[in-house]
């Protein structure tokens, strides 16, 4: 028996197919000539060609076996070592300024130097193993910091006031410490105070007023919160009283 097959497509559907065949994709351009005699070749825009050769394979084929490393070895080494330089630079400059760099050191001084070297090694190790994490965090912090650039003048003035208020106790501590411990106390004092000043500047720039302590305002807020909770506990209506029909 011969299968009599009649097409169910209307003339409108056939016209749409002819239009779609002759349409040109503006993004891809003209279709290249396709030789149907060669079975191994496929039209470049066919679905099978897309599956067999995805867009990412072109980059992988031309990589010649090399892996994409976003953090090369030399860059990691340079940035990690830079953190050590920034950590040690203030102390070295201060010791050079005081003309006390490796001069007349006793057991206490060498102990401090050993502790300082151990801290430098820990910082270098942390910077190396957590390179991707802390670089991304620093990048986000810098972007957020630059968005708050209008707060920089006020933050700078607050840091300046902070230095004035704490300056007199620092001088007093330096005089009390004496000649023997004066160098170490002064060095630790400078480092700690510099770190505190930088932290205050960053905090006041990102969130103005966050470093100020207003005890009365906080007490008022806590008292108001407690009073609100106290009122809500006594004014809360049980569900049974709200729905008397549920008891019935």
Swiss-Prot record:
Family matches, as Pfam families: WTF
GO cellular component: cytoplasm; vacuolar membrane
Subcellular location: Spore membrane; Vacuole membrane
Residue span of region Disordered: 30-68
TM regions (residue ranges): 73-93, 110-130, 152-172, 186-206
Membrane topology: Multi-pass membrane protein
Main location: membrane
Keyword Transmembrane: yes
Keywords in alphabetical order: Membrane, Transmembrane, Transmembrane helix, Vacuole
Keyword Mitochondrion: no
Signal sequence residues: none
Record function comment: Acts as a suppressor component of the dual wtf meiotic drive system, and can suppress but not confer meiotic drive by compatible poisons. Wtf meiotic drive systems promote unequal transmission of alleles from the parental zygote to progeny spores by encoding a poison and an antidote from the same locus; the poison is trans-acting and forms toxic aggregates in all spores within an ascus, wherease the antidote is spore-specific and targets aggregates for degradation by the vacuole.
Subunit structure: Homomer. Interacts with other proteins that exhibit high sequence similarity.
Family: Belongs to the WTF family.
Protein's recorded name: Meiotic drive suppressor wtf1
């Amino acid at each position: 028996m011969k299968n009599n097959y009649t097409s169910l497509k209307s003339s409108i559907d056939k016209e749409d197919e002819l239009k779609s065949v002759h349409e040109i994709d503006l993004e891809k351009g003209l279709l290249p000539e396709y030789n149907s005699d060669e079975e191994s070749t496929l039209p470049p825009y066919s679905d099978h060609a897309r599956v067999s050769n995805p867009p990412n394979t072109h980059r992988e084929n031309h990589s010649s076996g090399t892996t994409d490393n976003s953090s090369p070895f030399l860059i990691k080494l340079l940035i990690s070592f830079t953190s050590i330089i920034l950590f040690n630079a203030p102390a070295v400059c201060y010791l050079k300024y005081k003309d006390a760099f490796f001069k007349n050191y006793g057991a206490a001084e060498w102990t401090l130097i050993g502790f300082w070297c151990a801290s430098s090694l820990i910082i270098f190790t942390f910077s190396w193993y957590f390179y991707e994490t802390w670089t991304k965090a620093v990048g986000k912090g810098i972007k957020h910091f630059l968005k708050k650039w209008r707060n920089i003048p006020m933050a700078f003035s607050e840091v300046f006031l902070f230095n004035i208020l704490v300056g007199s106790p620092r001088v007093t501590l330096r005089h009390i410490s004496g000649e023997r411990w004066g160098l170490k106390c002064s060095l630790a004092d400078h480092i700690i105070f510099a770190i505190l000043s930088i932290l205050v500047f960053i905090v006041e720039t990102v969130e103005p007023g966050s470093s100020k302590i207003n005890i009365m305002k906080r007490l008022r807020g806590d008292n108001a919160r407690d009073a609100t909770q106290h009122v809500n506990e006594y004014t809360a209506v049980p569900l049974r009283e709200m729905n008397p029909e549920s008891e019935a």
